Amino acid sequence: MTKKMNVESFNLDHTIVDAPFVRLAGIKEGINGDVIHKYDIRFKQPNKEHMEMPALHSLEHLMAENIRNHTDKVVDISPMGCQTGFYVSLINHDNYEDVLAILEKTLNDVLAADEVPACNEVQCGWAASHSLEGAKAIAQEMLSKKDSWHVIYQPGKEPQA
């Protein structure tokens, strides 16, 4: 990685991060003063493990629906194509500790769910690809490691400035 790229995550050295973690990935300010904070919610260690698509898909539905019960600041929650995490974008909300609390509440909602919201052909583009049990397992694993969500890099491997 010598040339700086346009995509923030392409400039992140994925070999030194230590998932799971919650990382501020970017800040954008609009012309009217609104500020978007984008967070990298990394569930799985890059290039070592990933979420299976049916479980990831259900987790996406569950988190997208339930996170909005805990804050009205969510702009979007999107899965990463590499299947290791999600991006969560919030408008005019910059409190990292509150983001962690919102994520914890949302993942607890996943554990309490008895169905995947919008899991049908009318509301979902691939309704056959879901796993509530898989989503719950991912949420449980993430919650079990919540004390380390603030640790982004492997010990002694922080990026050089």
Swiss-Prot record:
<dbReference type="InterPro" id="IPR037005">
    <property type="entry name" value="LuxS_sf"/>
</dbReference>
<dbReference type="GO" id="GO:0043768">
    <property type="term" value="F:S-ribosylhomocysteine lyase activity"/>
</dbReference>
<dbReference type="GO" id="GO:0005506">
    <property type="term" value="F:iron ion binding"/>
</dbReference>
<keyword id="KW-0673">Quorum sensing</keyword>
<feature type="binding site">
    <location>
        <position position="61"/>
    </location>
    <ligand>
        <name>Fe cation</name>
    </ligand>
</feature>
<comment type="subunit">
    <text>Homodimer.</text>
</comment>
<protein>
    <recommendedName>
        <fullName>S-ribosylhomocysteine lyase</fullName>
        <ecNumber>4.4.1.21</ecNumber>
    </recommendedName>
</protein>
<comment type="function">
    <text>Involved in the synthesis of autoinducer 2 (AI-2) which is secreted by bacteria and is used to communicate both the cell density and the metabolic potential of the environment. The regulation of gene expression in response to changes in cell density is called quorum sensing. Catalyzes the transformation of S-ribosylhomocysteine (RHC) to homocysteine (HC) and 4,5-dihydroxy-2,3-pentadione (DPD).</text>
</comment>
<comment type="similarity">
    <text>Belongs to the LuxS family.</text>
</comment>
<feature type="binding site">
    <location>
        <position position="124"/>
    </location>
    <ligand>
        <name>Fe cation</name>
    </ligand>
</feature>
<keyword id="KW-0456">Lyase</keyword>
<dbReference type="Pfam" id="PF02664">
    <property type="entry name" value="LuxS"/>
</dbReference>
<keyword id="KW-0408">Iron</keyword>
<dbReference type="InterPro" id="IPR011249">
    <property type="entry name" value="Metalloenz_LuxS/M16"/>
</dbReference>
<feature type="binding site">
    <location>
        <position position="57"/>
    </location>
    <ligand>
        <name>Fe cation</name>
    </ligand>
</feature>
<dbReference type="GO" id="GO:0009372">
    <property type="term" value="P:quorum sensing"/>
</dbReference>
<keyword id="KW-0071">Autoinducer synthesis</keyword>
<dbReference type="InterPro" id="IPR003815">
    <property type="entry name" value="S-ribosylhomocysteinase"/>
</dbReference>
<keyword id="KW-0479">Metal-binding</keyword>
